[in-house]
Each structure stands twice: as structure tokens, then as C-alpha cells.
């Protein structure tokens, strides 16, 4: 049975530099086209953690050495990352589709996502961006005015505000493109964060979590399924411990209980489970799947992954 699927890719799965990204999108595109070949409508979203951090750092470094080089706000850095990633991803998807004899247009949409100016996240930056640093490197960057936090045992990363998405500004455009039979790449990096001021949309200094933005998009375009891709095949409780348990299905009540018990790492699995549960809760019959990219096709068939449902 054909489904309308929002597929959320992680920014870390797209490589750490230009060469790595070009290789990664080819592998990613093969898995995405596997789903399209099955008859599913696939809307692709993606993270931008490494990429937006590099863009921001590059312009900051240039501004320190070149008087005429501007400091770019985070909203503009997110917009740049949407074009940078979308360009490679849409071309890789187009090539993979044509190689299989599938004539389906691919479009990358510059997408704005509304956030609340009073969201408490602006007072407590938590969203990791950019490269990993050692503790010593983190101390030096802190002295330079950056905020860094330890990221799930992998090192230290810069963090910025991560408000919850309220509205997808270009949602009608996404719907129109999907209805016209196109593969749409949208809400890249969680979307460009904007605050509504009357008829004006003002860029916000933040990076929206792409899993939360993907869940909101999936709700607003009436998707059947949200697939959140990660580095592991299934969600686990007691991860890394002797009593580690991998989960095939996760009810909303169990998801809430495991979140309260602290089973999922902040900045890693926690936002994925929270976003998946939010989508599943939004309407009866909606399901979210968390799995690894190479198993997405099997996950839809119920053979692997963790399904979050009512």
C-alpha cells in the first residue's frame, strides 16, 4: 500500500565536508529511491548540524580578518545550508531515479519555520552544531564567548537555541509539489527559524531540531508515516548496559515513561523519540518509525526498526 512518508535524514549522515557529502548523498539516494520505487510518496528532510556550524564558523573567521566581511545571523547560515545540502542531494536523487527509469522531478525548497519569540529555549541553548571538540579545546572556545556542552559521550560541541516549530511557512507549496508528483527536499536543518511580526517574518538566532520540524511538517501535510533515521537499527532502553533492550514497538504511554526515566540521551535519541511520539499522537492511525537508513525499506514492511504508535 502506497504511503505518504516524511523521511528525516540526520546532518551527520551527510558527511563532514564537501567530498564526504557528495559520497554520502549517493548512498542516501539509493535508499530513498528504493522507497519511491515501491510506490510511496517521499518528502525528504535533513539535518545540518555539522554543515551549519562550519558555515557559521567560516563567516565568523572571515569577519575577524576582513573588515568588509559580514557576520551572518544563524537564520541566514541555515538558509545557506539548505542550498548547500539540497543541491547535492537533489542531483543525487535525480541521477538515481533516472538510472532506474523513473521520471520524477526533484525540488529543493527553501523553507522557513515559525517559532515563538517567547520560547524558553532562547534562554537555554541546547542544540549541538558544528564539529566535536576535546575538553581542552572547549575550554578555549568558552573563553572566546561560545557556549559548548558535552554531546552524548562523543566530545564537546557548540550549542545554540533550539525552539519548537510552530508553523511551516511553505507548507502549501510542499503540498502542491507533492501532489504534482515531485520529490521534495524541505525543512532542511529544521527550517530557517523565523518569528512572525504582523506580515513580516524576522530571522531568529536559532537552529530548530530537524526531527521536531519533520514531525510538524508531517502533521501539516497529512503524511501517513514519519521515518526518523539514525545510526542504530532500533531504539533501546538501558543503552550500553548489561540489561540493554532493543524495542520493536513503542506505545505512547511507554515512550513517555521511558523519557521520564531518562533512557534517551539529550541531543541524540531523546528528540527523535519525542518527535516521533508527537506525530503518532497527532491523529489515530499515524505511525513513526525510527531506524537506520539501510533498513528503511524493511522498516516500512514491519521487519525491523522501532515503531511508535498509539
From Swiss-Prot:
GO terms for molecular function: carbamate kinase activity. It comes from the Bacteria. One of its GO terms (cellular component) is cytosol. Keywords: Kinase, Transferase. Gene3D superfamilies: Acetylglutamate kinase-like (3.40.1160.10). The keyword Kinase applies. The keyword Kinase applies. CDD domains: AAK_CK. One of its GO terms (biological process) is arginine deiminase pathway. NCBIfam families: arcC (TIGR00746), PRK12352.1 (NF009007). Belongs to the carbamate kinase family. This is Carbamate kinase-like protein YqeA.
Amino acid at each position: 500500500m502506497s504511503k505518504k512518508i516524511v523521511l528525516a535524514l540526520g546532518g551527520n549522515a551527510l558527511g563532514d565536508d564537501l567530498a564526504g557529502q557528495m559520497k554520502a548523498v549517493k548512498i542516501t539516494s539509493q535508499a530513498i529511491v528504493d522507497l519511491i520505487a515501491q510506490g510511496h510518496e517521499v518528502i525528504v528532510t535533513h539535518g545540518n548540524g555539522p554543515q551549519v556550524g562550519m558555515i557559521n564558523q567560516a563567516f565568523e573567521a572571515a569577519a575577524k580578518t576582513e573588515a568588509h566581511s559580514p557576520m551572518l545571523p544563524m537564520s541566514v547560515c541555515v538558509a545557506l545550508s539548505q542550498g548547500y545540502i539540497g543541491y547535492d542531494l537533489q542531483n543525487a536523487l535525480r541521477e538515481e531515479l533516472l538510472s532506474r527509469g523513473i521520471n520524477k522531478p526533484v525540488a529543493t525548497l527553501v523553507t522557513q519555520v515559525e517559532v515563538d519569540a517567547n520560547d524558553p529555549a532562547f534562554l537555554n541553548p541546547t542544540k549541538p552544531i558544528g564539529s566535536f571538540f576535546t575538553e581542552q579545546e572547549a575550554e578555549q572556545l568558552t573563553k572566546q564567548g561560545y557556549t559548548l556542552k558535552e554531546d552524548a559521550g562523543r566530545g564537546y560541541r557548540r550549542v545554540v537555541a533550539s525552539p519548537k516549530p510552530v508553523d511551516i511557512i511553505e507548507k502549501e507549496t510542499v503540498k502542491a509539489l507533492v501532489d504534482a508528483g515531485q520529490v521534495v527536499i524541505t525543512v532542511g536543518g529544521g527550517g530557517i527559524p523565523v518569528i512572525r511580526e504582523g506580515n513580516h517574518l524576522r530571522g531568529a538566532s536559532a537552529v530548530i531540531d530537524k526531527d521536531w520540524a519533520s514531525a510538524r511538517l508531517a502533521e501539516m501535510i497529512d503524511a501517513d508515516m514519519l521515518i526518523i533515521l539514525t545510526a542504530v537499527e532500533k531504539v533501546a532502553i538501558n543503552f550500553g548496559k548489561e540489561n540493554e533492550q532493543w524495542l520493536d514497538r513503542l506505545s505512547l504511554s511507554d515512550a513517555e515513561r521511558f523519557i521520564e526515566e531518562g533512557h534517551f540521551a539529550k541531543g541524540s535519541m531523546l528528540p527523535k523519540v519525542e518527535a516521533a511520539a508527537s506525530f503518532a499522537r497527532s491523529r489515530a492511525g499515524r505511525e513513526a518509525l525510527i531506524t537506520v537508513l539501510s533498513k528503511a525499506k524493511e522498516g516500512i514492511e514491519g521487519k525491523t526498526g522501532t515503531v511508535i504508535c498509539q
